[in-house]
Amino acid sequence: MKHLFSFLTLALLLSGCTQKEVKAPEPISPLPTPQQVAWNKLETYAFVHFSLNTFNDLEWGYGDTDPKTFNPTHLDCEQWVKTFKDAGMKGVVITAKHHDGFCLWPTKLTEYCIRNTPYKDGKGDIIGELSAACKKYDLKFGVYLSPWDRNYAEYGTPAYLDYYYAQLKELLTNYGDIFEVWLDGANGGDGYYGGAREKRSIDGKNYYNFPKIHQIVHELQPNAVIFSDAGPGCRWIGNERGFANATNWSFLRGNDVYPGYQKADELTSGHADGDTWVGAECDVSIRPGWFFHESQNDQVKTVDQLTDLYYRSVGHNANLILNMPINKEGLISKTDSTNLVQFYQNIEKQLADNLLKGITPKVSNERGGAYVAKALTDDNYDTYWATDDNVINSTITFKLPKAEQVNRMMLQEYIPLGQRVKVFTVEYNDGDKWLPVQMNEETTTIGYKRLLRFKTIMTDGLRITINDSRACPCLNNIEAFYAGETTDVSFDNQAKDIQSLNYKVLNVEETDGDKIKDKNGSTVLLIDNRYITLDLGKSVAINSFLYLPDISGQHKGSVDHYTIQVGDSENPTQTIAEGEFANIKSNPILQIVHFTPVKARYVKFSAKSLASEGPMAIAEIGIK
């Protein structure tokens, strides 16, 4: 018996020695840093726009607004943070300094800051207050510091760079851990500039010396992710509507893209041939504007709209940074906070019951070892299924215990090894045959997370086919849900809400003129001579002008600087309003100009400049 035991022991040992060790798949470049992976896992966090603009009904301050107008009466950063926590958000980024140059902290570098406001008799520090609230409630804290400064006299010279670097160092050394530093791509243009009141142009790619800025951030806050059009930590999605494309690569061509990059549409999908990992961040506001405007109190995004944004951002391999404008009291308004929290509850409800939990699927190929099919449903981020090397197409088949209703799916790649999947399909078992699930979008990339919505099916089987991949696929999670029956939502209803006096367009063909009063935002009038004259039929009292730019996403000829003239002849000359439609290219929303009531028959709207080359573009015009 003793000899038999020894023989069996030796046989087992020899068997173990000869068993082939299964190696993990080789990473495929480009790869994320550990900080970028951690950032992706945050998924949603808040943006806070709060500044002088809040108290002066502005989006982009000119740089000359009086600091004494900044006076929130009931400011409570804990109210903000508790709202974000209740909405499942993991952090917040605040506009420490927007383009107007006003600073929300008592900086030692300029007088244009909170120190010279009535708030707390000049002893306030909103950056400090928010940082403390985040620490108290375990929320991550980030800062937005605009490179463009319309107040600073030396903007455009090397002296401004020293000022900007010093501001950045103040923020990164005095307020604890920073998870994200936000560098806006808007730069150069007209401004106050210490009283010069002029337009200044800079080389957006080289002026700021972004490598120097990155060095400062990495030295002082090594775990912070840097946002800009080009990253290097995360990138702008190319629009301010909060949407990523269904095809979304976490790559950019690093030598091509820079902050202020003009080909914004490329950022919505990334570069499939990119050599640098730069994950996408979708920025959008819960209201039409970024700063608080009382006129937008009835335009807060609904729970259904916010839910749709989640699927088109987080569900498209991007993070969602959702702006919550702070009102004049210093609080998040009730409707905004209610809709935000209910949106989170709605997502939690829709994705609550994973129908694939604990089911080990059948796969056409698996690598073996730790990289097997059961890793797809074990609820462990760091375990994953992978195929053998050079096997870039395969199937994953789930058999459910019984037929279930299904209308949502979640897929995740193990991104520490790179983003791989290029095309996949989903099918369901319909008795004796497999049928394709009818999607409303292409099934191409997956990345950190892909969420699929489709019409409800009844099935006891789901099959995912990886049709093409950059290397052997590595997936760490697949889930399926029944989210209940939901309705489609629309964001482009601005046109139908425009109320206006009747008018006739004089300087275009009648059929073309109808495009700007048909309450259809998708019909756009293009005018080469960059002005339009409207005939009200008779002299009437008017006090406001409404302009809806091209909202199709094509960024056609939006007016960014305008003049409005009135009179009783077809060539009116009395100027009643002129100014700027700030940020209109990135955020093409309805613009409303209010002016002192005046009687006139004719109204002339002229573009002093456009946000993009080409003819002047008008979707709708209203006169009240």
Where does each model-flagged region fall?
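Sec-dependent signal peptide recognition
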Residues: 2-8
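Short, well-ordered beta-strand elements within core beta-sheets of diverse protein domains
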Residues: 397-399, 531-534
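Mature catalytic domains of secreted/periplasmic carbohydrate-active enzymes
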Residues: 20-392, 397-398, 402-405, 410-419, ...
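Glycan-recognition and processing domains
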Residues: 352-378, 490-518
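C-terminal motif of bacterial Sec signal peptides marking the signal peptidase cleavage site
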Residues: 15-16
